[in-house]
Amino acid sequence: MKMRNHKENGNGSEMGESTKSLAKMEPENNNKISVVSVSKLLLKDSNGANSRSSNSNASFSSASVAGSVQDDLPHHNSSSSQLGQQHGSSLDQCGLTQAGLEEYNNRSSSYYDQTAFHHQKQPSYAQSEGYHSYVSSSDSTSATPFLDKLRQESDLLSRQSHHWSENDLSSVCSNSVAPSPIPLLARQSHSHSHSHAHSHSNSHGHSHGHAHSASSSSSSNNNSNGSATNNNNNNSSESTSSTETLKWLGSMSDISEASHATGYSAISESVSSSQRIVHSSRVPTPKRHHSESVLYLHNNEEQGDSSPTASNSSQMMISEEANGEESPPSVQPLRIQHRHSPSYPPVHTSMVLHHFQQQQQQQQDYQHPSRHHTNQSTLSTQSSLLELASPTEKPRSLMGQSHSMGDLQQKNPHQNPMLGRSAGQQHKSSISVTISSSEAVVTIAPQPPAGKPSKLQLSLGKSEALSCSTPNMGEQSPTNSIDSYRSNHRLFPVSTYTEPVHSNTSQYVQHPKPQFSSGLHKSAKLPVITPAGATVQPTWHSVAERINDFERSQLGEPPKFAYLEPTKTHRLSNPALKALQKNAVQSYVERQQQQQKEEQQLLRPHSQSYQACHVERKSLPNNLSPIMVGLPTGSNSASTRDCSSPTPPPPPRRSGSLLPNLLRRSSSASDYAEFRELHQAQGQVKGPSIRNISNAEKISFNDCGMPPPPPPPRGRLAVPTRRTSSATEYAPMRDKLLLQQAAALAHQQHHPQQHRHAQPPHVPPERPPKHPNLRVPSPELPPPPQSELDISYTFDEPLPPPPPPEVLQPRPPPSPNRRNCFAGASTRRTTYEAPPPTAIVAAKVPPLVPKKPTSLQHKHLANGGGGSRKRPHHATPQPILENVASPVAPPPPLLPRARSTAHDNVIASNLESNQQKRSNSKASYLPRQSLEKLNNTDPDHGIYKLTLTSNEDLVAHTKPSYGVTGKLPNNLPDVLPLGVKLHQQPKLQPGSPNGDANVTLRYGSNNNLTGNSPTVAPPPYYGGGQRYSTPVLGQGYGKSSKPVTPQQYTRSQSYDVKHTSAVTMPTMSQSHVDLKQAAHDLETTLEEVLPTATPTPTPTPTPTPPRLSPASSHSDCSLSTSSLECTINPIATPIPKPEAHIFRAEVISTTLNTNPLTTPPKPAMNRQESLRENIEKITQLQSVLMSAHLCDASLLGGYTTPLITSPTASFANEPLMTPPLPPSPPPPLEPEEEEEQEENDVHDKQPEIEELQLMQRSELVLMVNPKPSTTDMACQTDELEDRDTDLEAAREEHQTRTTLQPRQRQPIELDYEQMSRELVKLLPPGDKIADILTPKICKPTSQYVSNLYNPDVPLRLAKRDVGTSTLMRMKSITSSAEIRVVSVELQLAEPSEEPTNLIKQKMDELIKHLNQKIVSLKREQQTISEECSANDRLGQDLFAKLAEKVRPSEASKFRTHVDAVGNITSLLLSLSERLAQTESSLETRQQERGALESKRDLLYEQMEEAQRLKSDIERRGVSIAGLLAKNLSADMCADYDYFINMKAKLIADARDLAVRIKGSEEQLSSLSDALVQSDC
């Protein structure tokens, strides 16, 4: 459909429907567009536009570029606007106002700051004749398709940095373009509406709604480019903003036949069939060629040229028949088929358009020199420009853009006639589209060649979306015809390459130049530019020729490596070759372009005022509008902007790897370096460059290799997110200043944009010094390592306030230092380290910490130790103070990484432990070490590192190290009240080395840590907070333990779970100060300063520090009430003597602190190792004791006490221990933490002993008595009665007992039973719920079946995780169970007011606990399943080895025997279960007694038979064992013994778990039903 060229461009309100489809469908609308308003779409009221165009470039964001040439563009009124001249006032602009443009620019800048660079890049490349020649190197359409393909591939490559894919671009078109460009589009669309430029979605643009439409249409364009007007809008804008290589507003000119799917249009549209590709003028980003829009500006060239593609889709030929003379310059059917890429390539677009314009103008000038100035700009407005500018552009269908190539191409050669512009008439009015920053300014100056009213037929050719890939720019006048098809194609990139296009050099005006703010005086300016252009032209031309030659020689040989492109309509050269060639060409062209740009810029000054605006916009994608630029943005003056814009564009564009906008392939660093060099050499105006740096440079920095998302960095600009450098980097420099500096550097690196924002104003010169092009300098930004630091940590946050050691209350001041110094290191360390610094740090830290504490329970723990390096929980650095207070200043190990020299010393040792421990603090930064390594590490050293160790490591890596011996005598004496240990430990766990070590120590969860010398032990546990440093105890840090209490409790490390719970619970930090003070008193007590060498000594929990209780309440409660068992009460006596109850491996090893009164062993124990181990053990044991053994009244009391302790100092003081607290989950850890902190103070005042009954369930029994003895031994005694003995034996045997033992019940199970019994006592007799809670007791299967496996078979810890499976299982279970228990304890800590409320409360807690129990059992069930798989693999390996050495029949015997063992075991267990159920029923169901008895008799018979079978199988097993002994090594025989027995054990354990899970679920269902009924 032709678009009638109306001189009356007065239809300012022409349908904004200038979508391509409109173009297609609304010839009449197009008619409305007056010829004069060739660029009318983009034009605003000539007056307003002119004024605007004179000073400000009408910039459109990429999205709006195509859609709207800024008012400036076509202001025929403005004398500067050639169009204005030609069109006269008829180019009434509808739409874009400067305010709108600015708004759009702002938006675009905010969204796509980096786009500016993209544009800059693109303009340079597009300008380069190299690209032009490259694009049109082969006249044949096939060659073009090949180029397109190359572009595609290149784009894909460069897209990596930009993260653009064709699809992405097309999709983004709608999204990204819409946001910023659309508003502009809306305005522009108004102006567009006159011309109904195809592109602006609903160019009607009268309504912003349309603008939005445009954005959405852009996406649709990408899809089908359809005939949706919206698509048009979007397309142009997309084209502008899209990162497509060319994404020029008027890229239509570069239509090649082979535009298969190279461009977005092709990709979005399947219409790649037209293989004619427009090589978008945005060649600078050749990669984005797919996005290139096809725009034929030459009237001369026959539409036929591109008709193949064009024919594809019926193109709406917007044939403005420019009559001429004045507005006759009809824009050639600029089919703007921008494949709009989502990015906001407005800059690109403007650049591209400009190049295109230049080319077109050149051609036009070449046809009509007189007009060429205007034409130049006119042509420049390529797809987008044309879309915007061409009066008939309405037809310029977005579909064209969609088709990126094809659409614009005039689909109908027939329409050519309609365009029927005489060659002479072809003077397309010059349409200049300047897109800078996010603005696209399209200036359409109808070229005066009055005599030659060449009808610029915008054969937008609505080539249906189909012809999208086919740029049918065919409608070219005979004159254009004269230009070879290639010329037309060149024309397409013309402005980009600035061919010597016949006629003024102005045509060469690089995009920036021709793209003045508006068409204002464009002709005049262009001439000014022309000199630059002229100078460049020859160069460009020579470059183009050279490139063409190169392409012809290499790319021109496509047939050599030819293959059919996807549409199979054209042969394309080897894609790889193309990519290489394209990259080379692009790089070369960009360099050339850059140089020429600079030269032109130098020449430009004449037209700088206008050009500068355009240039600036281009160069300042971030500065949405030139004015937006931080530099003399306000001044639209060309000089500043000119310089700045030219320079900035290339580098930023290049740099914009981060920005999708920076789609230009030329974004490679090398290219940028070259650009920089070129710019530097040319002496680009640095001022402008700096200014560009403000926005673009920031991006370029990012591009440099820092790929922070452009938008976020912008947003963050103000925010100095301090990303701590990696621990490795900062480990050496532990100074706060270093950390801060690093943070700043890292932040800059990571958020170069932000920094740039600041920089442009503040230090733009810094980056700019490199030259605008050198924005690429970003590579010089701080090394990536720092960025890693940045990313890794924020110094502010990472430094949690050191856990306020209760004892070290004076220490809180350290918080600031500590935090800063620690910056990533655990502040807890600081606590132990130099007390004074720590105190300081603590003071500062707390404020920062608060954030972290809340966020991470682990961080809270970190305060204690395990938590993150920060002391988030209470931000109280007091724990550290505690250390300080303690005579021992050695705590340095606890000090943050960046600490004083003393701290450094400690750190040196601590680093080891830290690495072992891996606290969130420093540990996070430092490379993590394996748990084993950590375990191996000396606890003393480990402490500091433990502090660093992240909780994650502690939790995740916590391996029960069974034989963790208190390497140092400094281990906290197990004697210390568990409450203290636990509390402190929890705190320690998070932050303090101990806390962190807890997990690590867990491995050696030897409470014994007997090596801990009492002296050191106390200081380490300055309350939960200190716990972090605790690990250092042994070294100087333990001593620093607050001497406040002679009893420097060296607390044994509690189980990792404890640590976890501590982490979970703010307990770590809860008593940071108070807890730590009291705790460290208590800790000593707890640790009992047993001789370091005496792990066995019974821990004498000292009741001294009540605060210990708080600490323990936090950690203990969370871990297990039992651990808190040693209540804050000075006398923890209620707790059974810490006869360490060691439960066999699986069984919980419980250590009851018998010496509750044991005054805090004043001897400060070296807590380093013992603390870690003890903490681990304590944690684990606590959970176990809590669940299983805390059932004892004393244990219950312990529960209550811990809870109370943490909640209230008074509780700690009181023998809260007495009130049994059922262990419950410690959900309210943080709140507790706070409470405990408060209470900690009280606790500090109130000494109390918390005995700690630690039950550790694991195959290895960790005896975490308050005693330092570490009974990692997996002592699995069936009876709790045996536990004491076992514990004793364990202490002696240590790890000797690691045999297969029956599954031990989890602490949570025991806790639940205890809670159930308590609740039943409160219920009235006969209550339904009581019946549910007291299910009938069945005899254990062990009474019916025994010897299912040999319990004497040693565990194979090394071989199977399963070996420790029970242990591991129990550990994991205990950790979770302990945490849950803690919550319950806390809740139960306070007695209920009324019986009814009490019952309801207990019932709720019981149900919650039951749910937790089920979850825990299921988790264990899953673990057993994994163990079974591992064991089966072991059996398969043995079978495979045996099969290699024996006959198949013998090997089959082995397999048969293995299967038989599994079957008989399952059978015996099943029969025993049924027997137990039957006999249990006999007692209750008397009426069915007869039937039940007969059933029981039958089962006995079956059982006897099964026993006989079992004995037969065992005999066969002996023969199998003999077979193995003959053929396999002793180790393999041992493996077999283990395998066969483990198989039976796992079957038994799995059945036991299944039964318990089923029963628990039934009980839960019954309870729920009963409660519902009772409530009713």
From Swiss-Prot:
Residues 1232-1296 form a coiled coil. Residues 46-69, 76-91, 128-142, 212-244, 267-283, 376-388 have a biased composition (Low complexity). Disruption phenotype: During axis elongation in the embryo decreases localization to adherens junctions and planar polarization for both Rho-kinase Rok and myosin regulatory light chain sqh. The mislocalization of sqh impairs the generation of sustained actomyosin contractility during cell rearrangement and can account for the reduction in the formation of multicellular rosette and convergent extension. RNAi-mediated knockdown in the embryo decreases Rho-kinase Rok localization to adherens junctions and planar polarization during axis elongation. Has no effect on Rho1 localization or activity. The keyword Ribosomal protein does not apply. The modification Phosphoserine is found at residues 404, 667-668. Residues 1305-1572 form the ASD2 domain. PROSITE patterns: ASD2. Residues 1-31, 46-100, 112-142, 187-244, 267-434, 589-609, 621-660, 699-728, 743-823, 849-876, 910-939, 1036-1055, 1091-1116, 1210-1244 are annotated as: Disordered. GO terms for biological process: actin cytoskeleton organization; actin filament organization; actomyosin structure organization; apical constriction; cell migration; cell morphogenesis; embryonic morphogenesis; establishment of planar polarity of embryonic epithelium. GO terms for molecular function: actin binding; actin filament binding; kinase binding; protein homodimerization activity. Signal peptide: none annotated. Residues 798-816, 1094-1108, 1217-1229 have a biased composition (Pro residues). Residues 189-211, 748-759 have a biased composition (Basic residues). Pfam families: ASD2 (PF08687). The ASD2 domain mediates the interaction with Rok and is required for apical constriction induction. Belongs to the shroom family. Binds to Rho-kinase Rok and targets it to the apical cell cortex where it mediates apical constriction. During embryogenic axis elongation, required for the localization to adherens junctions and the establishment of planar polarization of both Rho-kinase Rok and myosin regulatory light chain sqh. May be involved in the assembly of microtubule arrays during cell elongation. This is Protein Shroom. It comes from Drosophila melanogaster. The lineage of its organism: Eukaryota, Metazoa, Ecdysozoa, Arthropoda, Hexapoda. The gene is Shrm.
